[in-house]
Regions:
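A charged, aromatic-enriched C-terminal amphipathic alpha-helix characteristic of glycosyltransferases
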Residues: 336-343, 348-381
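Nucleotide-activated donor-binding/catalytic signature segment of Leloir-type glycosyltransferases, i.e.
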Residues: 172, 258-281
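Conserved donor-binding/catalytic core segment of Leloir-type glycosyltransferases
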Residues: 209-231, 237-243, 249
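N-terminal pre-catalytic "stem/leader" segment of glycosyltransferase-like enzymes
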Residues: 4-139
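A short, active-site helix/loop in glycosyltransferases that binds the activated sugar's phosphate group
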Residues: 157-195
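Short hydrophobic beta-strand element within catalytic cores of glycosyltransferases
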Residues: 312-318
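Short beta-strand->alpha-helix junction loop in the catalytic core
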Residues: 98, 150, 197-209, 255, ...
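Aromatic "clamp/platform" in nucleotide-sugar-dependent glycosyltransferases that forms part
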Residues: 294-295
């Protein structure tokens, strides 16, 4: 079936009438096949999602007469951490598939007199939830935080979701958007969408600080890169190989990266799978520096998390952090795909580690105030 779809895509104009019909048929057949072959699994998943809805309904009672609440999916770790770092009135909510569950959420919002509902990204079922809330009470403001950038439109899922969300805005079902990268905010504002700017932030005072083990080796971390091309893991590994006496700590490490380190004879202390955020934050405290030289980005949480743990993080020139500051001169990369350049920046970062961390602490004070003001502006308007 996938081969047939790919064949059709080669010869039919994307977003043309025939293509849309074929895509719709393909989607219907694929969905039917999945439901038949995974009936038991689907029932269990939907039962879980209904339980989460009931928990959300109970939590909404705590925000009676509130100016706003924010729904977020706790299983989407980046979005979840972003939401927790920005807002106080937050409600975990996963996918919503049952009509009765959409009705429960809608009724709870209306009955608790919540003035504004913010959706931090969009899960399955949230589009229908937005429609129903507006149909029941058009005075309730609906706002959406878009955590992605234009690169993600290459994904059919994200592109189709983007079209649905933008169409809801044009129909008056969504009142405004917030973006966590300035270029996205500026573009959509100029394109006529009511837009606000937010900046991701982290507060990690509750994370245990661990004593760094004494060693002659320089441990350098690469995290949450996995197999995604944009995360640039192979350039990072190449650069670490060039750093004298260096060890790469890669979590998770995929088979390709593992083979590459063997070819390079690069020593690693790595794990094959993702680990809980709390465990990761303790782990990185053993490092000299962490690498995040992605080819495209939005507002990544990890660089901030790394700095909060006292470890500098080199990051790509594709987000809003540290721009125009001395700190940025140390840690913002301009040639993410150059191992030799990256090696030099790693060494420079290690040599100036104490100064870099101090610069971060000074920068963070002003950054916290900015983040709070952006949130207030978004919530009240």
């Amino acid at each position: 079936m996938q081969k047939l779809k790919n064949c059709v895509k080669r010869f039919i104009k994307k977003d043309g009438f025939i293509y849309r019909i074929v895509r719709k048929i393909y989607h219907i057949l694929s969905t039917a096949k999945y439901k038949i072959t995974n009936n038991k699994k689907i029932k269990e998943e939907h039962k879980h999602y209904s339980i989460v809805v009931n928990e959300a309904v109970e939590k909404l009672k705590n925000y009676k007469d509130a100016d706003y609440v924010v729904f977020y999916n706790p299983t989407w770790l980046g979005v979840a951490n972003s939401t927790k770092g920005l807002f106080k009135n937050i409600v975990p909510l996963e996918h919503v598939y049952e009509k009765k569950d959409i009705q429960k959420i809608t009724d709870a919002i209306v009955e608790n007199n919540i003035k504004s509902v913010i959706f931090s990204q969009i899960c399955d079922g949230w589009i229908d939830t937005i429609k129903q809330i507006k149909d029941k009470n058009k005075e309730i403001k609906i706002k959406v935080i878009w955590h992605g950038n234009c690169y993600e439109y290459f994904s059919d899922f994200t592109w189709n979701l983007n079209k649905e969300v933008m169409n809801l805005y044009k129909k008056g079902k969504i009142d405004s958007f917030a973006f966590v990268r300035s270029i996205m905010y500026e573009f959509y504002k100029k394109a006529g969408f009511k837009s606000y700017y937010l900046q991701n932030n982290v507060h990690l005072d509750n994370i245990e600080r661990v004593e760094k083990q004494k060693t002659d080796k320089k441990k350098i971390g690469i995290y949450n890169a996995d197999t995604r091309e944009l995360k640039n893991i192979y350039t990072s590994l190449s650069a670490i190989k060039l750093v004298p006496n260096a060890i790469a700590d890669v979590v998770p490490i995929n088979e390709g990266a593992k083979k590459f380190t063997e070819i390079l004879k690069l020593e690693t202390t790595s794990i094959d799978d993702y680990i809980p955020t709390e465990e990761l934050l303790k782990r990185i405290q053993q490092n000299e520096v962490n690498l995040y030289p992605t080819f495209t980005e939005n507002a990544p949480m990890f660089p901030l998390e790394s700095f909060e743990m006292g470890v500098p993080c080199l990051l790509g020139n594709n987000n809003d952090y540290f721009v125009g500051t001395k700190l940025g001169e140390y840690v913002i990369l301009t040639k993410e795909d150059d191992p030799e350049y990256l090696k030099d920046r790693i060494i420079n970062c290690i040599e100036h580690k104490e100064e870099i961390i101090q610069l971060y602490k000074e920068w963070k004070k002003d950054f916290d105030k900015k983040c709070e003001s952006y949130v207030k502006d978004f919530v009240k308007n």
